[in-house]
């Protein structure tokens, strides 16, 4: 009788493979980005210097500057007009709305609660800026494109179902839980 080597094991993408773990890491990292930028808006502090490490986040004032610039430069007149005539004049409200929306996106992604919806929310926040600045050529591989690609992936993949609350919600609601 001859011994045969065991058959190689195959892994499926749906199992807890390296891909699932990488999506989980991407979800958590992107959630931290949104959460920290939301906190920068809440506390109106964008620059941090820890001595050995310094960095900047987007405060409400910086966000208003980015939107003002994008709305002025865009070739999409209705989108620019929306920001110039509605959002920017009402920045006292919209600045806080942005902070709370980023906070919701950050918490959703970080904890994996309705993670696909959170990713779509992030796309809704960042997408218009990228679209308004598309023709300038300045932001193709910089902010906000560096946030768009991960958000697109996270809107497609159910990354919150591994090491996230979406997993428990799927167990409870089954196919009725779409995130």
Predicted regions and their residues:
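Extended, low-polarity transmembrane helix blocks
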Residues: 1-104, 111-179
């Amino acid at each position: 009788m001859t011994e045969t080597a065991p058959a190689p094991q195959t892994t499926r993408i749906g199992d807890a493979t390296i891909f699932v773990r990488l999506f989980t890491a991407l979800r958590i990292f992107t959630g931290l980005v949104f959460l920290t930028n939301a906190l920068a808006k809440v506390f109106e502090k964008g620059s941090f210097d820890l001595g050995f490490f310094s960095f900047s986040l987007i405060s409400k004032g910086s966000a208003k500057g980015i939107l003002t610039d994008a709305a002025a430069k865009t070739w999409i007149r209705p989108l620019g007009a929306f920001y110039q005539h509605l959002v920017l004049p009402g920045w006292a409200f919209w600045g806080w709305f942005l902070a709370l929306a980023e906070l919701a996106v950050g918490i959703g992604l970080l904890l994996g609660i309705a993670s696909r919806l959170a990713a779509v929310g992030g796309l809704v926040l960042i997408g218009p800026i990228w679209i308004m600045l598309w023709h300038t050529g300045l932001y193709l591989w910089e902010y906000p494109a560096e946030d768009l690609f991960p958000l697109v992936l996270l809107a497609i993949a159910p990354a919150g179902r591994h090491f996230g609350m979406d997993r428990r919600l799927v167990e409870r609601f089954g196919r009725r839980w779409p995130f």
